[in-house]
Amino acid sequence: MKVVAFERQQQGTGASRRLRNAGKTTGIVYGGEAAPQMIELDHNALWHALKKEAFHSSILDLEVAGKSQRVLLRDVQYHPFRQLVLHVDFQRIDPKKKLHTKAPLHFLNAETSPAVKLSSAVVSHVVTEIEIECLPADLPEFLEVDLSKIEAGQSLHAKDIALPNGVALTAHVDAENPVIASATIPAGAVSDEAAAGEGETPAA
């Protein structure tokens, strides 16, 4: 995915406000052997790009002054109540060094699971992304979580995710192995089942 930015010469609160009034968003590019670079981007184009999941989880081709560099989006600052992006941070990528980032989780097949089909359970997504480490060339846009075998009362953990070759959970995620999805029977459904059971007449 390509992102076009421009070199930013002016700094400070006043300069940032003037840029916002002109439909621009401030940013910075850092990392690697090059010095940090102050940039500005078209706000509307950036706003629409930020709505795409891939913009947050993929390596981007950032073009500044006609030169392209490969980066990851690392931080976004939004206005507290207006639909306004105040600032973005991009990190340069070294193709030979592993990066730590968050990958989105795509949950599949819950509707065909025993939890839903046999028990009318509700499958909840506890987290929507997980921290991973890999070389830039191995970075997945997302990770799939197959829920087809989950049963009522069960949970899936981070280590249950089928990771692509070259991709691993970060050390602390691997150690904690957090819950990523769970299947629970709603309280109302349990009460209804109990009431139905009590209403049954024992066989003579």
Curated annotation (Swiss-Prot):
Which UniProt keywords are given for this protein, alphabetically ordered?
Answer: Ribonucleoprotein, Ribosomal protein, RNA-binding, rRNA-binding
Alphabetical list of InterPro entries matching this protein: Rbsml_bL25/Gln-tRNA_synth_N, Ribosomal_bL25/Gln-tRNA_synth, Ribosomal_bL25_b-dom, Ribosomal_bL25_C, Ribosomal_bL25_long, Ribosomal_L25_dom, Ribosomal_uL5_bac-type
Query: What is the role of this chain?
Result: This is one of the proteins that binds to the 5S RNA in the ribosome where it forms part of the central protuberance.
Q: Which GO terms describe its cellular component?
A: cytosolic large ribosomal subunit
Q: How does it assemble?
A: Part of the 50S ribosomal subunit; part of the 5S rRNA/L5/L18/L25 subcomplex. Contacts the 5S rRNA. Binds to the 5S rRNA independently of L5 and L18.
One Gene Ontology MF term:
structural constituent of ribosome
* Any Gene Ontology biological process: translation
Entries under PANTHER family matching the protein: RIBOSOMAL PROTEIN L25/GLN-TRNA SYNTHETASE, ANTI-CODON-BINDING DOMAIN-CONTAINING PROTEIN, RIBOSOMAL PROTEIN L25_GLN-TRNA SYNTHETASE, ANTI-CODON-BINDING DOMAIN-CONTAINING PROTEIN
This protein's species is: Burkholderia mallei (strain ATCC 23344)
List the CDD domains. Answer: Ribosomal_L25_TL5_CTC
Q: By its UniProt entry, which Gene3D superfamilies does this protein fall under?
A: Ribosomal protein L25, beta domain, Ribosomal Protein L25, Chain P
A Pfam family the protein falls into: Ribosomal_L25p
Family statement: Belongs to the bacterial ribosomal protein bL25 family. CTC subfamily.
Name of the protein: Large ribosomal subunit protein bL25
Query: What is the superkingdom listed in this entry's lineage?
Result: Bacteria
* Entry keyword annotation includes RNA-binding: yes
